[in-house]
A protein has these predicted regions:
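Cysteine-nucleophile active-site neighborhood
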Residues: 1-69
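Amide-donor transfer/coupling interface in amidating biosynthetic enzymes
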Residues: 48-153
């Protein structure tokens, strides 16, 4: 199943993965027993358990711009600007490849970090997004799903 999911995503199937789904897409996961287990392999890197909550609480996400000078390379789910999205993180795991598609900022703080992987058909990261607060993200994802469905006919 891992290989089939990875092949479908690499072939262009839209994927929106938050938290545990993001972890599943990594190459490896270090279990509570200290052993590394193979995962889907869509996202290079490894996830592992930390001794305490990591990046806990409410955040605001803003899509990073200027990753490339070509607009299509900065587009996520076909959009060059998905706007600002409230979200939260609540996890004991961390990744050596959290992504750089968005910048997370803590409210009333100067603390922030880059996070999430984004491409024309993928959005994946630890943050849990609040879709009602920014419907552009689920709308863009659903549009990509419909486009993919048409290509499969």
């Amino acid at each position: 199943m891992r290989q089939e999911i990875a092949a479908a995503i690499k072939d262009g199937m839209p994927c929106l993965a938050e938290c545990g789904g993001f972890m599943y897409l990594h190459e490896k996961m270090e279990g509570m027993d200290g052993k590394c287990y193979e995962m889907a392999g869509v996202i290079p890197g490894k996830v592992w358990r930390t001794p305490r909550l990591t990046r806990f609480g409410y955040i605001t996400l803003k899509q990073n711009q200027g990753i490339s000078h070509r607009k299509q390379e900065t587009a996520i789910l076909g959009e060059s600007d998905l706007g600002v999205s409230p979200a939260h993180e609540f996890h004991y795991f961390d990744s050596d490849n959290c992504g750089t598609a968005f910048h997370a900022s803590k409210p009333e703080s100067k603390r922030g970090w880059d996070c999430m992987h984004g491409s024309d058909h993928l959005l994946a990261g630890f943050p849990h997004l609040y879709y009602y607060a920014n419907p552009k993200i689920p709308q863009a994802f659903l549009k990509k799903c419909l486009e993919y469905k048409e290509l499969q006919k």
